[in-house]
């Protein structure tokens, strides 16, 4: 079955079927923008909510801490309405709702971004239902409607979309993305909302019920592909991992080792593959073990710094997933900015789940197979 998945997806690519490629560009992170405006320290001090709150929201109210998006840098273009209005969105496999700012939102965050005007769209229909997503320091309030969303060559009609009427604080003011397009399972979506990719599948708008993500380390060639697997973005073979809970893209990690010694996830643990989270997030005790092993030291805001001169001496961290080893070298799990190096590992106090974000996806081409509820991983080029 797994070989058939690859053959069909690659065949579809070669035949030029409904294959949709969305170039992702690497923009300025929210962290860097806040730092430039002198707001980063205040933001970090005010964040009281753990990463895991993103993974506990159901019904009309969802919870997503802003720290999830602090280092996100990969964004793409979509178009909403008739005639189309352009938006930059974060494609997020860790959530399922789709929302953009609207003209009814007067907060600074909305004023600094593209705002959707439903009055100018002949295809917009007001659903008359509220949407609320909690973001640590406040809530995004909005309304739900239907409209046509265009993603590259796909025209997706009658798509539910959230239109924000209020966005929290000033933090989103400096984000390079306007809105968020969730790509997790429909069980995570707000009430009355259908995820964009589900609507595409239901209307047979994609060649295969899967999508794949390549995140270029330099940000120049990053790509989201809907309906196909593109072998030009990886080397070797794809290895398949069963989804254990059909809410997130969740699977079992066997262990995390350094030099053959288990340092985290002993006996196995659950992990989520999440394009909307930038770092590698895990339980506090596990992350502390890893930070100590790689020589990272905690700063006053709870983040971990690394001496850039030590990168060549630091160990490789290996994730074992479904019997396959996925090594991460120091250059993969650290980031460097203006002479400062930071660990790509982040602790979470309130969850035993791991979150494998962009740090992992940059190293491993990722396939999200809804038809068979599998995740495919291969070494990225």
UniProtKB/Swiss-Prot annotation:
Disulfide bonds join 105-110, 265-269, 308-341. Its EC number is 3.4.23.4. The keyword Disulfide bond applies. GO terms for molecular function: aspartic-type endopeptidase activity. Residues 1-16 form the signal peptide. Keywords: Aspartyl protease, Digestion, Disulfide bond, Hydrolase, Protease, Signal, Zymogen. The active site is at residues 92, 274. InterPro entries: Aspartic_peptidase_A1 (IPR001461), Aspartic_peptidase_AS (IPR001969), Aspartic_peptidase_N (IPR012848), Pepsin_A (IPR034162), PEPTIDASE_A1 (IPR033121), Peptidase_aspartic_dom_sf (IPR021109). This is Chymosin. The lineage of its organism: Eukaryota, Metazoa, Chordata, Craniata, Vertebrata.
